[in-house]
Amino acid sequence: MAERSDPLTRGLVALIRGYQVAISPLLPPACRYYPTCSQYTLEAVRRYGAIRGSWLGIRRLCRCHPWHPGGYDPVPDLPGSAPEENGRPSPDGQHSGSGG
């Protein structure tokens, strides 16, 4: 999915990058996930825009606590964002979408 470029998304990306560059290096590592919560939110906002990306980031932050094991947790592909939609066959030859 292409990166969003509306003003709100650009502003959020700038704020997250500012945190990553100016604040995060001063704090001890605390994130239990890979990618880190700030990197996850940055990618989510770039991929899905300010509203949906922020929601994904907030949900991730709520999961990042000492009682959760953490681990690998990439930004999900949301339904309908797969390249094989609209009835075109996927690489394994199966059809998807409403056509077909």
Curated annotation (Swiss-Prot):
It is a peripheral membrane protein. The keyword Repressor does not apply. Residues 73-100 are annotated as: Disordered. Keywords: Cell inner membrane, Cell membrane, Membrane. It comes from the Bacteria. It is found in: Cell inner membrane. It holds the Pfam family YidD. Its main location: membrane. GO terms for cellular component: plasma membrane. Belongs to the UPF0161 family. Could be involved in insertion of integral membrane proteins into the membrane. This is Putative membrane protein insertion efficiency factor.
